[in-house]
Curated annotation (Swiss-Prot):
Disruption phenotype: No visible phenotype; due to the redundancy with PRORP2. Prorp2 and prorp3 double mutant is lethal. It catalyses: Endonucleolytic cleavage of RNA, removing 5'-extranucleotides from tRNA precursor. Belongs to the PPR family. P subfamily. The gene is PRORP3. This is Proteinaceous RNase P 3. The lineage of its organism: Eukaryota, Viridiplantae, Streptophyta, Embryophyta, Tracheophyta. It comes from Arabidopsis thaliana (Mouse-ear cress). It is an enzyme of class 3 (hydrolase). Residues 65-88 are annotated as: Disordered. One of its GO terms (biological process) is tRNA 5'-leader removal. Mn(2+) 1 binds at residues 402, 480. Binds 2 Mg(2+) or Mg(2+) ions per subunit.
Length: 576
């Protein structure tokens, strides 16, 4: 079969070389090919007695990988030019970062020594920060600790004498160096100076931690408490390591009231404690000082203790040590129903306290009103206060339902829509679970309610709910989220929704508060092959608990997902 000779653009026509050695000379190094030529590229076969040469028009520019010195030095190779023009300060910083990644302190110090003797390099804050960080990383290495501390302070002194103000990262590194040699006072002074200067660089927990932990290790309790007060004034929240250290130093120095305070802080901020913290708690209760602590008579006032527990939301009273005599410490498990298998006491499902709940409710009202004020006045919207008044009048509910979330669950298919049967199933299930046979309250947007009323298959049930105050229609232009969240918070009842309420977390109170509230009040649901399953709140909270009898239960962090396998410290008094 005879091949049809393709037509070539004139710019690409070339003669067949008489020998192979001339092929390189024949093909241009770079050929500009238009997009149309590239799209219509065809294989061309040129033949003579010595060579069969196959050329793609579109690949001719890439056939020669050899480059001349002129090509390498041309502006078309920006990387080499950029590398050649890199300034010495930037080169030093890159090399220091490389030392940090390799954990090579000796190499970093050698670079620093060379830099301070060079007239071409002016050290800046980034250089000093990188060096100080690397020095602080070796304070726990016995072979390099002394060098790291000594050279670290030399570097810091040069930084300050150069007129460079240390930022938070630099102060943190030097504070760690100071604490490593037992100078908690200097570590604390660095933080106080940083706060006094002000500006954009502010201290963090890691900035305070070296001084606080140093004072605790050296049993300088009062200085440790001073650091804590300074942290509190700066809005820094303690975490487990710091609280545990303060508890240890308080126990070691016989400050029983401080020990009680830090147990409460662990309950509030941590929940489950680590093995290390549990050992510190155990040592305190086994000690002589703990057995000498008495309740000063409050243990006999059961009504006072119960009222305090109720006010706090359950799980603690906060009035101080209760009982007399030695403590008995056991490690055991808690049943799925919340019963301690060591002492038979039932643990509480801890709720938010009255003050927190009231603040939460007020915040919801404020935000709902602000949203209303920002909306276009042309849109009809009933005042949120109308719902507040309605709820005050009819607010005898044990559960609130996010109607839209339930009705639209798993309805994202071709014929899917709002499922009233799903909503009805939840209403019936909660009614049957209610000991007092109370109906829940459904909150649903008015537009959705009107659509259901227009459907003859749904009208009777919806009208029945409205007449029995089981259904409240939120007004047009409103966000029904605020309504069901407000109702559940105000009535301190259950909230049935799968909504994670992440938006609310960021807009309302602290994340820790909202998580605690959700754990106690949110009911999640699923429908498996049409069958409803409600996931009720757990019967007890996995946090440190203090009972009205004076006993303590401390959950320990566990890798087991099965809650019944978690270890708990059960701490009771012989007289209780």
């Amino acid at each position: 079969m005879k091949l049809k000779k393709p037509s070539l653009p004139s710019s690409l026509l070339c003669a067949v070389p008489p020998c192979l050695s001339q092929i390189r000379l024949l093909i241009p190094r770079r050929v500009r090919v238009s997009s149309s030529t590239f799209a219509n590229a065809k294989l061309v076969t040129l033949r003579n007695h010595t060579v069969n040469l196959h050329i793609y028009y579109c690949s001719m520019a890439g056939t020669d990988n050899r480059r001349s010195r002129h090509d390498d030095e041309s502006p078309k190779n920006p990387n080499k030019k950029k590398k050649g023009n890199r300034n010495p300060e930037k080169s030093l910083l890159i090399n220091l970062h490389s030392c940090s990644k390799r954990k090579d302190l000796s190499a970093a110090l050698a670079l620093y020594d060379a830099a301070i003797t060079s007239s071409d390099i002016r050290l800046n804050q980034q250089h000093f920060q990188s060096l100080l960080y690397l020095c602080s990383a070796f304070i726990s290495d016995p072979s390099l600790q002394t060098v790291a501390i000594d050279r670290g302070f030399q570097i810091f002194d040069r930084m300050v004498s150069s007129g460079i103000s240390p930022n938070e990262s630099s102060v943190t590194a030097v504070a760690r160096l100071a604490a490593a040699k037992g100078d908690g006072d200097y570590a604390f002074k660095l933080v106080k100076d940083l706060v006094a200067v002000g500006g954009v660089s502010v201290p963090r927990l890691r900035t305070y931690a070296p001084a606080l932990l140093c004072f605790c290790d050296t049993l300088e309790a009062e200085k440790g408490y001073e650091v804590e007060d300074h942290m509190d004034a700066s809005g820094i929240v303690l975490e487990e390591a710091e609280i545990s250290a303060l508890l240890k130093v308080s126990a070691a120095t016989g400050r029983e009231n401080k020990v009680y305070r830090y147990l409460q802080k662990l309950r509030e901020c941590v929940g489950c404690v680590s093995e290390e913290t549990s050992k510190a708690i155990e040592e305190w209760f086994y000690g002589v000082k703990a057995s000498e602590v008495s309740d000063n008579g409050i243990g006999s006032d059961i009504e006072l203790l119960r009222a305090a527990v109720l006010k706090n939301g359950g799980g603690w009273h906060g009035l101080g040590w209760v009982g007399e005599g030695k403590w008995i410490v056991k490690k055991g498990n808690v049943s799925s129903a919340g019963k301690c298998l060591s002492c038979d006491e039932h643990l509480a499902c801890v709720d938010t306290n009255e003050v927190e709940t009231e603040d939460f409710v007020n915040s919801l009202v404020t935000l709902a009103m602000e949203r209303k004020a920002k909306m276009n006045s042309c849109e009809p919207m009933a005042d949120f206060s109308e719902f507040q008044e309605w709820l005050e009048k009819h607010g005898d509910y044990e559960a609130i339902l996010d109607g839209a979330n339930i009705g639209l669950y798993q309805q994202n298919f071709a014929d899917g829509g709002f499922s009233l049967p799903q909503l009805e199933a939840v209403v019936k299930e909660l009614y049957n679970k209610s000991g007092s046979k109370k109906q829940p309250l459904i909150l649903l947007h008015k537009k959705r309610v009107n659509a259901l009323l227009e459907n003859p298959n749904h009208r009777n049930l919806v009208e029945e709910w409205i007449n029995n105050n089981v259904l409240y229609a939120t007004p047009p232009g409103s966000n029904d989220d605020w309504y069901w969240l407000y109702a559940a918070a105000k009535l301190k009842c259950l909230l049935v929704t799968n909504d994670e309420m992440r938006d609310h977390i960021f807009e309302l109170l602290s994340n820790s508060f909202f998580q605690k509230w959700k754990e106690r009040h949110q009911v999640r649901f699923t429908f498996v092959k049409g069958c409803l399953k409600l996931e009720m709140p757990p019967p007890f909270s996995v946090v440190i608990q203090e009972s009205e009898k004076g006993s303590w239960h401390v959950p320990i962090t566990s890798q087991d997902k099965e809650e019944s396998l978690r270890s708990w410290m059960c701490i009771t008094r012989q007289s209780s």
